[in-house]
C-alpha cells in the first residue's frame, strides 16, 4: 500500500513538473523543475528495485546535465527574453511532435517488439528464476552485453560521431579574427615592445 501511494506521488509530481517545464516562461524555473522531474524519476526507479539505474540517473542527469543547463541559463541571463511568436505557433508543432510520438508508441505496443525480438531478444533469459542469485548490476550487464550488444555498439558509434563533430567544429578558424601567437610573443625584442610617445601640448 505504501509503495502504491509513493508510486502515485512520484508519478503525479513528475507529470506536474514536466508540464511546468514546458509552460513556464522563465528558463531558470524551467531548469529547476526539470531537476525536480529527474528526482521523481529516481524515486520511481528506486521503487522498482533498480538501485544502480537510479543512482546512475541521479549522477548523470541531475549532477551533470541539469546543473550545467542551470549554470548556462543563469550566465546567459535569458529570463528577460520574451517570446516573439504566438502560443498557437508553438502549440501546433508541439501537438504534431506529440502525435508522432504517440503513434510510434502505438506501433511498438501492437507489434509486440517484433523487430527487436527477431534480432536482439533471441537469447533472453528468465531473470525471475535467478533473482536471488544475481545482483542488479550483474543482470543489467548480462542483458546489455548479450541481448543488446548491437545497440550498445551503435550507441558507442553515436558518441564517437558526436565527439568528432565537436572536434571538427573547434578546428575551424576564421582568418579575420585576431588571435595571440605565443611563438611570436616569445621571440619579440624588448626594444621594439615598449615605445614612448610624446604628446604636444
UniProtKB/Swiss-Prot annotation:
One function term, GO molecular function aspect: NADH dehydrogenase (ubiquinone) activity
KW Transmembrane (keyword) present: yes
Organism encoding this protein: Cyanidium caldarium (Red alga)
Superkingdom of origin organism: Eukaryota
The family this protein is said to belong to: Belongs to the complex I subunit 6 family.
Gene (UniProt): ND6
Predominant location: mitochondrion
Membrane topology note: Multi-pass membrane protein
Record's subcellular location: Mitochondrion membrane
Protein name: NADH-ubiquinone oxidoreductase chain 6
Pfam families for this protein: Oxidored_q3
Broadest EC class assigned to this enzyme: translocase
EC number(s) given by UniProt: 7.1.1.2
Entry's transmembrane regions: 4-24, 28-48, 55-75, 88-108, 151-171
PANTHER family, sorted: NADH-UBIQUINONE OXIDOREDUCTASE CHAIN 6 (PTHR33269:SF17)
Keywords of the record: Electron transport, Membrane, Mitochondrion, NAD, Respiratory chain, Translocase, Transmembrane, Transmembrane helix, Transport, Ubiquinone
Gene Ontology cellular component annotations, sorted alphabetically: mitochondrial membrane
Catalytic reaction equation(s): a ubiquinone + NADH + 5 H(+)(in) = a ubiquinol + NAD(+) + 4 H(+)(out)
Function noted in UniProt: Core subunit of the mitochondrial membrane respiratory chain NADH dehydrogenase (Complex I) that is believed to belong to the minimal assembly required for catalysis. Complex I functions in the transfer of electrons from NADH to the respiratory chain. The immediate electron acceptor for the enzyme is believed to be ubiquinone.
Amino acid at each position: 500500500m505504501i509503495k502504491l501511494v509513493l508510486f502515485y506521488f512520484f508519478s503525479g509530481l513528475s507529470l506536474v513538473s514536466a508540464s511546468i517545464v514546458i509552460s513556464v516562461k522563465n528558463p531558470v524555473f524551467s531548469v529547476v523543475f526539470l531537476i525536480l522531474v529527474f528526482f521523481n524519476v529516481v524515486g520511481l526507479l528506486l521503487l522498482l528495485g533498480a538501485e544502480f539505474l537510479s543512482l546512475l540517473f541521479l549522477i548523470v542527469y541531475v549532477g551533470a546535465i541539469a546543473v550545467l543547463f542551470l549554470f548556462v541559463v543563469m550566465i546567459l541571463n535569458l529570463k528577460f527574453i520574451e517570446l516573439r511568436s504566438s502560443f498557437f505557433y508553438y502549440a501546433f508543432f508541439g501537438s504534431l511532435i506529440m502525435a508522432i510520438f504517440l503513434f510510434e508508441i502505438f506501433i511498438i505496443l501492437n507489434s509486440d517488439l517484433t523487430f527487436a525480438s527477431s534480432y536482439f531478444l533471441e537469447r533472453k533469459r528468465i531473470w525471475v528464476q535467478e533473482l536471488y542469485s544475481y545482483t542488479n548490476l550483474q543482470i543489467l550487464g548480462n542483458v546489455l552485453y548479450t541481448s543488446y550488444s548491437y545497440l550498445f555498439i551503435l550507441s558507442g558509434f553515436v558518441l564517437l560521431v558526436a565527439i568528432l563533430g565537436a572536434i571538427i567544429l573547434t578546428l575551424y578558424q576564421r582568418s579575420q579574427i585576431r588571435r595571440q601567437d605565443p611563438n611570436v610573443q616569445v621571440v619579440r625584442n624588448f626594444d621594439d615592445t615598449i615605445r614612448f610617445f610624446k604628446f604636444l601640448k
